[in-house]
Amino acid sequence: MKYDLIIIGSGSVGAAAGYYATRAGLNVLMTDAHMPPHQHGSHHGDTRLIRHAYGEGEKYVPLVLRAQMLWDELSRHNEDDPIFVRSGVINLGPADSAFLANVAHSAEQWQLNVEKLDAQGIMARWPEIRVPDNYIGLFETDSGFLRSELAIKTWIQLAKEAGCAQLFNCPVTAIRHDDDGVTIETADGEYQAKKAIVCAGTWVKDLLPELPVQPVRKVFAWYQADGRYSVKNKFPAFTGELPNGDQYYGFPAENDALKIGKHNGGQIIHSADERVPFAEVVSDGSEAFPFLRNVLPGIGCCLYGAACTYDNSPDEDFIIDTLPAHDNTLLITGLSGHGFKFASVLGEIAADFAQDKKSDFDLTPFRLSRFQ
């Protein structure tokens, strides 16, 4: 059988692509080296932020607004346990923060619902938060967080119900191109398709070693909290920048545990074996202490944590482009630790590519050629 589309990597983007392409009527094969959702990539740990006024640059705003529409649609499949939780997101940092300047600019350009607070206003609204006098907060009322593993599980189930073929726990070992399309090699045999999507995450260079993607080991952890820090008490998800430039992100507490991670830093790695479990690097359990001690002093000790991996591009912007010399293969990689919120729209973009539809978005900033 020759498929319309083969998806290599069925984590966040691949799961979405499988669903949207199958829903569009294509004959699709989803593949993954493991059984998604799983612990081997970048999507585990239960939750991911979604921010609309984007500190990484306004070029992302049209994408994230469409992503939000798709997340809302997906959430309707899980109304008892919604995939998207509109907790709000408070972005904290010094008044001269470049990141916060980008958030404010994005909000102004796209007329987003963002409220600016000074230090006293932040602490009055959320007494659990402490910030210096020179800090400001930009509160995104309509943003919140996503249940990442539930989302992937839902997409995979919906795709399967729609007739999508799924080959999991079976790594793709090679990709070949010829006049007939794309062929992948696996331990289960060879499979052919007219087109392919490569969204293999951290280890995409195992298949395409020439790509400018650097795996980085990262950790996040859960710390002892209480009901004051919960969504029920209107405690928001957050990003926070310390005076030294270190950037953190976190979520409202659930079951008396508040999850937090540090966005910058981490350990450069070159193989999956180098991504050692949480606590095997001496700094893992204390990485969030500078932020917690200064901004959330009521949070207690580290309860547990996990390691994941970023697939960083050189400029930490996404790579969304066809494979050089092979216009029938789309790369979506280099998501650099801020990609999950876009998984829905990136999956839709992949499905459009498979149908020869022109994208509704300007993807020029994400081309591979910018690194030449």
Swiss-Prot record:
Transmembrane region(s): none
InterPro entries xrefs: FAD-dep_OxRdtase, FAD/NAD-bd_sf, Me_Trp_Oxase_MTOX, MTOX
Keyword Metal-binding listed: no
Keywords: FAD, Flavoprotein, Oxidoreductase
Gene Ontology molecular function: any one: sarcosine oxidase activity
Enzyme nomenclature, EC number: 1.5.3.-
Modified sites of kind S-8alpha-FAD cysteine: 308
A Pfam family hit: DAO
Cofactor: FAD
GO cellular component: cytosol
Positions of FAD binding: 4-34
Cofactor remark from the record: Binds 1 FAD per subunit.
Highest taxon of the lineage: Bacteria
Catalysed reaction equations from the record: N(alpha)-methyl-L-tryptophan + O2 + H2O = L-tryptophan + formaldehyde + H2O2
UniProt subunit comment: Monomer.
HAMAP family hit by this protein: MTOX
Family membership noted in the UniProt record: Belongs to the MSOX/MTOX family. MTOX subfamily.
NCBIfam families in alphabetical order: PRK11259.1
Function: Catalyzes the oxidative demethylation of N-methyl-L-tryptophan.
Name of the protein in question: N-methyl-L-tryptophan oxidase
Protein species of origin: Escherichia coli O7:K1 (strain IAI39 / ExPEC)
Gene designation: solA
